[in-house]
Amino acid sequence: MKVQPSVKKICDKCKVIRRHGRVMVICDNPRHKQRQG
């Protein structure tokens, strides 16, 4: 999980979602998981 000021899709399978008011990226590739912080 990377915590970044701005989250972006890295590949085609990345999805940008909102969970508990936080913007997150979920993906099949665990290295692409990101959270805005």
UniProtKB/Swiss-Prot annotation:
GO terms for molecular function: structural constituent of ribosome. GO terms for cellular component: cytoplasm; ribonucleoprotein complex; ribosome. Keywords: Ribonucleoprotein, Ribosomal protein. Disulfide bonds: none annotated. InterPro entries: Ribosomal_bL36 (IPR000473), Ribosomal_bL36_sp (IPR035977). SUPFAM superfamilies: Ribosomal protein L36. GO terms for biological process: translation. The keyword Transcription regulation does not apply. HAMAP family: Ribosomal_bL36. Belongs to the bacterial ribosomal protein bL36 family. This is Large ribosomal subunit protein bL36.
